[in-house]
Amino acid sequence: EPSLGLAPLVVKGIFEIIQEINKQGVTVLLIEQNANMALKIADLGYVLETGRITLTGSGRDLLKNEDVKKAYLGT
């Protein structure tokens, strides 16, 4: 969870670095509670509840999912 406890400006920088690493051809496995930021940069995402995968899909698809919005994105 690279953004845990960090100021928003620092979080933005961390995610920019993660994206740059990925653009260089490196696969990144990211475990992150900040679902909004993580899904924005994810090619593929998993939603876990009580240790089980409940949803999977592209980051974009998961951001649009109504259940994900309600439970994790505060909308």
Regions found by a protein language model. Name each.
Residues 1-75:
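Glycine-rich phosphate-binding loops of nucleotide-dependent enzymes
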